[in-house]
Amino acid sequence: VNHYSTMWETGKAMLVCIDKVTCVKMYNLIDKYWKLKIKEQENEMKNCLDEQDEKEKSNKLQWLKETEYAVVVSEEQNEIDKFKKWDLDIIPHREKMKKRDLATEFKDNSNPFRLAIVCAMWLTGFDVKSLSILYLDKVLKEHTLMQTIARANRVYEGKNNGLIVDYIGVLKNLREALSKYGTGTNTEGGDSPIGEEKDLIEELVEAIRERSE
């Protein structure tokens, strides 16, 4: 919530969870902290420096209040009882998925449904050009990993790049996938295009130093 609310002008986002139960758990947590973030932003409105600052804070507050997040998971038999065992209620989420065309809404950049919480659906073959941030909390490998990270890599007006936030640690799998699938017709694989962590940190420090001079 903290991260996405600071990136609020960048586009839509998707959280990939390990399973369906975790999707609903994360929805509940996001809902809790999103409401707190709204209150926090309302308090920020009391400390505006000037008209421009007031306008920016007001726009962000409106975005927070309008933004909708939703669970998108496939239906299964006896799912109500399954979720009850975890003290969770899938019914309101399932009703929303059935009554609304969430896929179309999510693809519409002007629609306030901005954060999708998924575990398997929408990871492949589902293009949302305005999707800018992908939060990964599920171990993915090879083709599925490549397809998933490609969700945030579509070209869109005003979108400079896609951002992958890795909570689970898929760097090793990403290196392997890029080496295997990122070499065109070379089936024997190749070198990983991902730099070493030490070198990347040094580059980041140097870039920060140059900007501060």
Cite the ranges covered by each PLM segment.
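Conserved C-terminal RecA-like helicase domain
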Residues: V1-V118
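Hydrophobic alpha-helix feature that most strongly marks membrane-spanning transmembrane helices
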Residues: S5, K35, K107, N111, ...
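Cofactor-binding loop segments of dinucleotide-utilizing enzymes, especially the Rossmann-like FAD-
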Residues: I18, S74, K138, Y167-G169
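Catalytic cores of large soluble enzymes that bind and process phosphate-bearing ligands
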Residues: I18, T22, R94, K98, ...
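Switch/connector loops and helix/strand junctions flanking conserved nucleotide-binding motifs
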Residues: C23-K25, N78-F83, F126-D127, E142-Q147, ...
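Short secondary-structure boundary/capping segments
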Residues: L29-K37, F83-I90, S132-L134, I149-A152, ...
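A short beta-strand element within the Helicase C-terminal
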Residues: R114-V118, W122-Q147, G162-D166
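Long, hydrophobic alpha-helical segments
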Residues: R154-E213
